[in-house]
Amino acid sequence: MAEAAQQDAQQNFAIQRIFLKDVSFEAPNSPDMFQKEWNPDVKLDLDTQSRELGEGVYEVILRLTVTVKNAEDTAFLCEVQQGGIFSASEMEAGQLAHCLGAFCPNILFPYARETISSLVVKGTFPQLNLAPVNFDALFMNYLQNQAQQAEGEQA
């Protein structure tokens, strides 16, 4: 018990920087889209990736792509790559993977969501507020899929 408390006390996590890595907004059917009744179909794709920049320093990128169609036509497509540089040390491999795959994207998401909302409004479309994402559940699902694939390869 004392060892676990000591290990937790040694763990270190810090946000060094949050930055916008890439952004794109396309409204291919403007201004014709503004003349149509607004009944949007919103599709959200997200992905994360991370890489080590130096000892205990990691870049995490959260990529959000929002495609909104109205009827059959694309109203707009918005892609944001929100980046962060984080320092993390004295973590076990599983803890570090969870930190980079769930905790850090959870920190980045509000920044990416705000950028998307701002771009959509600047395109003069109705405001788009993305619902919160449970990155912990997505990460656990990813781990389960990896385990199933590993079992399938062994069989």
Curated annotation (Swiss-Prot):
GO terms for cellular component: cytoplasm. Its main location: cytoplasm. One of the proteins required for the normal export of preproteins out of the cell cytoplasm. It is a molecular chaperone that binds to a subset of precursor proteins, maintaining them in a translocation-competent state. It also specifically binds to its receptor SecA. Homotetramer, a dimer of dimers. One homotetramer interacts with 1 SecA dimer. HAMAP family: SecB. Belongs to the SecB family. This is Protein-export protein SecB. It comes from Vibrio atlanticus (strain LGP32) (Vibrio splendidus (strain Mel32)).
